[in-house]
């Protein structure tokens, strides 16, 4: 059943931070281990927290769009967007910090600057990178900021696409399957808990 409601109620209390932009274009609610809730939003080429729209954009970090895909994984919050170095939010010290992944003390390797990210099967999965829309990348086990060594890896789907060239647009996990949505096809892998051994299930 589809319903519609008239009007809207403003939640943010500091809309001046959005300037004359299109407003909030990305929104994500995060819940940490302590049960604390943080609402992240992206707009006006900035990243905000809370309804007061507190600007938490890392100093010196340049944002050119607000198409963030935001996921929670292992008590961290990750921000991905094509053409941007991924961002990482942690609250281990009791004071939340948003930083470029390369600035994080435990980060390793170079993460893909993908437009799609999925937290599933004990790791992060990323796809839709500028110049490469046919490869899925994955992080190390239980470590979304480790992109070299360990069980990190990637999968080139060039020879898997069932109807010629295609482009990955979204990733999902369902019934223990890794589902890869492309513009012209859907590709399903089984055994994604061990990516090095996962096999093609269906296209």
Features from the language model and the residues they span:
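Recognizes the extracellular SEMA beta-propeller fold with strongest preference
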Residues: 1-203
